[in-house]
Curated annotation (Swiss-Prot):
This is UPF0122 protein SSU05_0875. It comes from Streptococcus suis (strain 05ZYH33). SUPFAM superfamilies: Sigma3 and sigma4 domains of RNA polymerase sigma factors. InterPro entries: RNA_pol_sigma_r3/r4-like, UPF0122, UPF0122_fam_protein, WH-like_DNA-bd_sf. Might take part in the signal recognition particle (SRP) pathway. This is inferred from the conservation of its genetic proximity to ftsY/ffh. May be a regulatory protein.
Length: 113
Protein backbone atom coordinates (compact mmCIF):
# COMPACT_ATOMS: atom_id res chain seq x y z
CA UNK A 1 0.00 0.00 0.00
CA UNK A 2 1.34 3.43 -0.93
CA UNK A 3 1.90 6.13 1.68
CA UNK A 4 -0.98 8.27 0.38
CA UNK A 5 -3.33 5.28 0.53
CA UNK A 6 -2.27 4.52 4.11
CA UNK A 7 -2.74 8.17 5.04
CA UNK A 8 -6.23 8.21 3.50
CA UNK A 9 -7.14 4.93 5.21
CA UNK A 10 -5.98 6.29 8.57
CA UNK A 11 -7.93 9.51 8.06
CA UNK A 12 -11.12 7.70 7.01
CA UNK A 13 -10.85 5.37 10.01
CA UNK A 14 -10.40 8.38 12.32
CA UNK A 15 -13.31 10.29 10.78
CA UNK A 16 -15.42 7.14 11.01
CA UNK A 17 -14.66 6.90 14.74
CA UNK A 18 -15.93 10.44 15.27
CA UNK A 19 -18.91 10.50 12.90
CA UNK A 20 -20.12 6.88 12.57
CA UNK A 21 -23.27 7.64 14.56
CA UNK A 22 -24.30 10.13 11.85
CA UNK A 23 -24.17 7.51 9.08
CA UNK A 24 -26.78 5.02 7.96
CA UNK A 25 -26.24 1.36 8.78
CA UNK A 26 -25.31 0.62 5.16
CA UNK A 27 -22.79 3.48 5.07
CA UNK A 28 -21.28 2.29 8.35
CA UNK A 29 -21.04 -1.31 7.13
CA UNK A 30 -19.41 -0.44 3.79
CA UNK A 31 -16.89 2.01 5.26
CA UNK A 32 -15.97 -0.27 8.13
CA UNK A 33 -15.50 -3.28 5.87
CA UNK A 34 -13.55 -1.31 3.27
CA UNK A 35 -11.26 0.72 5.53
CA UNK A 36 -11.09 -1.05 8.89
CA UNK A 37 -11.38 -4.66 7.73
CA UNK A 38 -9.60 -4.18 4.36
CA UNK A 39 -12.32 -5.86 2.28
CA UNK A 40 -12.21 -5.34 -1.49
CA UNK A 41 -15.11 -3.78 -3.37
CA UNK A 42 -15.89 -7.22 -4.81
CA UNK A 43 -15.99 -8.83 -1.35
CA UNK A 44 -18.36 -6.17 -0.03
CA UNK A 45 -20.53 -6.43 -3.15
CA UNK A 46 -20.76 -10.20 -2.74
CA UNK A 47 -21.65 -9.95 0.94
CA UNK A 48 -24.46 -7.44 0.31
CA UNK A 49 -25.61 -8.88 -3.04
CA UNK A 50 -25.00 -5.62 -4.94
CA UNK A 51 -22.68 -4.55 -7.76
CA UNK A 52 -19.10 -3.42 -7.22
CA UNK A 53 -20.14 -0.07 -8.72
CA UNK A 54 -22.89 0.33 -6.12
CA UNK A 55 -20.39 -0.31 -3.33
CA UNK A 56 -17.85 2.06 -4.90
CA UNK A 57 -20.45 4.84 -5.29
CA UNK A 58 -21.66 4.40 -1.71
CA UNK A 59 -18.11 4.49 -0.31
CA UNK A 60 -17.23 7.62 -2.32
CA UNK A 61 -20.40 9.40 -1.17
CA UNK A 62 -19.74 8.38 2.42
CA UNK A 63 -16.12 9.57 2.25
CA UNK A 64 -17.36 12.96 1.06
CA UNK A 65 -20.00 12.99 3.80
CA UNK A 66 -17.39 12.24 6.48
CA UNK A 67 -15.17 15.05 5.14
CA UNK A 68 -18.18 17.41 5.08
CA UNK A 69 -18.96 16.58 8.71
CA UNK A 70 -15.34 17.30 9.64
CA UNK A 71 -15.36 20.61 7.72
CA UNK A 72 -18.43 21.71 9.68
CA UNK A 73 -17.83 20.19 13.11
CA UNK A 74 -14.00 19.92 13.39
CA UNK A 75 -14.24 17.11 15.94
CA UNK A 76 -11.24 15.17 14.63
CA UNK A 77 -8.97 18.17 14.00
CA UNK A 78 -9.84 19.63 17.42
CA UNK A 79 -9.03 16.27 19.02
CA UNK A 80 -5.63 16.21 17.28
CA UNK A 81 -4.81 19.74 18.45
CA UNK A 82 -5.90 18.97 22.03
CA UNK A 83 -3.75 15.84 22.06
CA UNK A 84 -0.73 17.80 20.85
CA UNK A 85 -1.25 20.47 23.51
CA UNK A 86 -1.62 17.81 26.22
CA UNK A 87 1.66 16.21 25.08
CA UNK A 88 3.44 19.58 25.08
CA UNK A 89 2.22 20.37 28.60
CA UNK A 90 3.23 16.95 29.91
CA UNK A 91 6.67 17.27 28.30
CA UNK A 92 7.22 20.76 29.71
CA UNK A 93 5.91 19.94 33.20
CA UNK A 94 6.50 16.19 33.65
CA UNK A 95 6.51 16.35 37.46
CA UNK A 96 3.33 18.42 37.90
CA UNK A 97 0.77 16.03 39.40
CA UNK A 98 -2.03 18.61 39.20
CA UNK A 99 -1.58 19.08 35.45
CA UNK A 100 -1.31 15.33 34.90
CA UNK A 101 -4.58 14.80 36.73
CA UNK A 102 -6.41 17.51 34.77
CA UNK A 103 -5.07 16.21 31.45
CA UNK A 104 -6.17 12.68 32.39
CA UNK A 105 -9.68 14.01 33.06
CA UNK A 106 -9.79 15.88 29.75
CA UNK A 107 -8.44 12.84 27.91
CA UNK A 108 -11.11 10.62 29.45
CA UNK A 109 -13.76 13.07 28.24
CA UNK A 110 -12.32 12.87 24.71
CA UNK A 111 -12.27 9.07 24.80
CA UNK A 112 -15.70 8.33 26.21
CA UNK A 113 -18.18 6.62 23.94
Amino acid sequence: MKFMEIEKTNRMNALFEFYAALLTDKQMNYIELYYADDYSLAEIAEEFQVSRQAVYDNIKRTEKLLEDYEMKLHMYSDYVVRSQIFDEILNKYPEDAYLKEKIAILTSIDNRE
